[in-house]
Amino acid sequence: MGVYHADALVIRSREYGESDRLLTLFSREYGKIQAVAKGVRKPKSRQRAGAQLFTYAEYLLHKGKSLDTVNQVSPRESFPHLWTDLDMSMAATAMAELLDLATLPGQPHPELFTLTFSSLFLVESCDPALVQCTYALKLMNYLGYRPRLVECAECGQRVQGERLLFSPDAGGVVCRQCQTQGSSPAVGRWVSGGSLGLMRQLLQGELEKLNRLRWNQWSKKEILEASQYFCEQTLDKSLRSWSMGNRLVNVGQNPSGKDDLNERRDVDGTGES
């Protein structure tokens, strides 16, 4: 395969050399592609639009030994709303980063392409953070990392309670009894029962019905942190854009009236504080 066509999204774009950009593309047919767009940083470059983050375009690519080369590009969608709203932009950046870290070049994932493409549109009509969390849970589920959110990941009993331990190492939520059993107690984050219920809906529900869901500021912060923690621990990689976005979430009061910054902390399974 010398020259080939690919309809792809730009999920990462960074400077490369004096006037080039190194693009990470994600296509339905080929999965992730690393390609150099030569000369696109020059003001008069005709291919400049095709090297912008989140652009969806038809690319004519030349296959190289380590990096492909963009020969021609025909932009189809630029998602302009992502550049006019900070929350939308940060959610899209977080999703693109997760997709990049969770996949390898040359492995097609048509379902993930559809999920990503749809989610970039959806942030305009739904809470961007809600779309971001849904995207993370569905992506991880597709890759085989479905968290157990109904039954205890350790004993299989249905979980109940106002505060539950969410442990990626265990594979999901852990009941009170299993939290302290054994020589190595489960490690994770405490999640409220309400947030856990919403996480179930995000994982199992349809994207088209996402705008029907509502969450408060406390649930937003809690689920964003739990989603990031789950992805990072499972993939063993750091999500930098997620950390930045979480810091910008406006912290309110949790349902008990206590400041949620004082309530949220890592735990070792021996207690909530």
Swiss-Prot record:
The keyword DNA repair applies. Residues 257-273 have a biased composition (Basic and acidic residues). GO terms for biological process: DNA recombination; double-strand break repair. Pfam families: RecO_C, RecO_N. Keywords: DNA damage, DNA recombination, DNA repair. It comes from the Bacteria. InterPro entries: ARFGAP/RecO, DNA_rep/recomb_RecO_N, NA-bd_OB-fold, RecO, RecO_C. One of its GO terms (cellular component) is bacterial nucleoid. The keyword ATP-binding does not apply. Gene3D superfamilies: Nucleic acid-binding proteins, Recombination protein O, C-terminal domain. Residues 250-273 are annotated as: Disordered. Belongs to the RecO family. Involved in DNA repair and RecF pathway recombination. This is DNA repair protein RecO. It comes from Desulfitobacterium hafniense (strain Y51). The lineage of its organism: Bacteria, Bacillati, Bacillota, Clostridia, Eubacteriales.
